[in-house]
Design a protein with these regions (language model features):
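Non-transmembrane, juxtamembrane loop and terminal tail segments
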Residues: 40-53, 125-129
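Alpha-solenoid ARM/HEAT helical repeat scaffolds used for protein-protein interactions
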Residues: 90-91
Length: 243
């Protein structure tokens, strides 16, 4: 509505695209929540030495639909980000919206790993390739978003749009927070892991980093209003990291 109804206002254009991106994340999270409805089967499956499919778990079709939906939402987010970035020459607001959408796409992609890990462990079909690849996917997405943010900050120094880089760094930290769930599921699946109790510290550390960046930006906001929005966004992202 904001994008179509206020096409001449750059603020509404940016806000509209960002809200739409958050909607895609909400759709991915709802898929993750749906896949967790039978989470209680995971401990029993993990204790089971065999790889026999648990009949109480999801069907193959349900598993594929859950993973497929998250993949679809992620592809939409990436395509959306690419289209916006391709229009950067039309105005800085397209660059800002496209960059943030790219960060949101990284989170959507990270949630694919979470949904796939949960769904497969519920069916007892989680294998060694899953144990290796899903955590890597989330860590790669977090690294991409974080480095993307650093590049924006350094490459656009002196430009108001460079403050978007701090938001990208925060979105990258959210990906790292998600990685804690995926890594924990992978590390304790059918094996013991001595540092399992330490993994939950990852969300705490990422949240503290977000809040530290937010505090820094609040100070900068006293000299430059361009830091007003990213400072508050990082506080919200810090809260998300705790979840």
């Amino acid at each position: 509505i904001w994008i179509c109804g206020f096409a001449e206002n750059s603020n509404f254009i940016v806000s509209g695209h960002v809200v739409a991106g958050v909607g895609l994340i909400a759709a991915c999270v709802s898929t993750a929540a749906t896949s967790s409805t039978k989470f209680y089967l995971i401990p029993a499956n993990s204790a089971n030495a065999t790889n026999e499919v648990n009949k109480e778990g999801f069907s193959v079709m349900t598993q594929n639909v859950l993973i497929g939906l998250t993949l679809l939402f992620s592809l939409i987010a990436w395509a959306w980000a690419i289209v916006l970035l391709s229009r950067s020459s039309e105005g800085a607001y397209f660059f800002v919206a496209g960059t943030v959408m790219g960060g949101l796409a990284c989170i959507c992609t990270s949630l694919i790993a979470l949904v796939a890990s949960i769904a497969k462990q519920i069916r007892n079909t989680y294998g060694e390739s899953d144990r290796k690849n899903w955590p890597k996917l989330v860590l790669v997405m977090g690294t991409v978003a974080f480095i993307w943010g650093l590049v924006v900050i350094l490459a656009m120094a002196g430009n108001v749009a460079n403050t978007t880089g701090f938001i990208m760094m925060g979105l990258g930290l959210v990906c790292f927070s998600i990685s804690s769930k995926v890594i924990l599921l992978a590390r304790v699946w059918k094996q013991s892991f001595a540092l399992a109790s330490r993994i939950p510290l990852i969300p705490v550390l990422t949240a503290l980093l977000c809040l530290f960046l937010a505090a820094f930006l609040f100070e900068e906001g006293g000299y430059d209003n361009a830091f007003f929005v990213p400072a508050r966004v990082l506080v919200g992202l810090g809260a998300i990291c705790f979840c």
